[in-house]
Amino acid sequence: MIDAHDIRFSYDGPGGRRSLNGAKLHVAPGELVAVLGHNGCGKSTLVKHFNALLPLQHGTLTVDGMDAADPDNRWALRRKVGMVFQNPDNQFVSTIVGEDVAFGLENYGVPEAEIPARVAAALAAVDMAGYENRATHTLSGGQKQRVALAGVLALSPDILVFDEATAMLDPDGRQEVLHTIHRLHTQQHKTVVMITHYIEEAIGADRVYLIHNGKMIADGTAREMLTQPE
């Protein structure tokens, strides 16, 4: 479903310091894949290519058969790949939960009459049914992150990418979000890519990639990663 080969990227342009230096990755349909590495190693830069948030400078990347280098695929990729980022507050566009989840649906061609049902279904999928009229400032960190996820789910993406989605949460919030991620993977058969620097968050993944200085240096099961020599 996702095939990335020799991805190289520099925020300063092709001749600048590389954030990615030949990264490669394969994600099969229905897999839960974790990308593990320290801060600044290129994890987030890599996954922002999946839905064309960053342009492809070098290498090849296909997502469900679509060439990420083709600008005509940009909006299709953004509907195919839903992303949840680190800080839920930065993802809110409204102070009301239901309005936030509904934001942008019309721009993606969802008929206005369908939007309330989409919002309700997305909130139910993250165990927040009935929260449509709640103020976002009354929510816990874990609840805010699940609302952000509901906004992604309302577009029915086939692939979910979580970019350090638990990094700013307390232990209870982390567990709420991790439980939701694994439930969506197992019950709704979503393909999931989870970016993290916590090995314990990668334990339940089908496969783990270890990235260092913009390049994959190992991949395997979480157990294999735990037994890798330093």
Give, region by region, the residue ranges found by the protein language model.
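Conserved beta-strand-loop-alpha-helix hinge in the C-terminal portion
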Residues: K215-E230
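Conserved ABC ATPase signature
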Residues: A135-L139, Q143
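Conserved ABC transporter NBD signature motif
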Residues: G59-A69, L77
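Helix-to-loop junction immediately C-terminal to a conserved catalytic motif
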Residues: N51
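The feature captures the beta-strand-to-loop junction immediately N-terminal to the Walker
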Residues: L36-H38
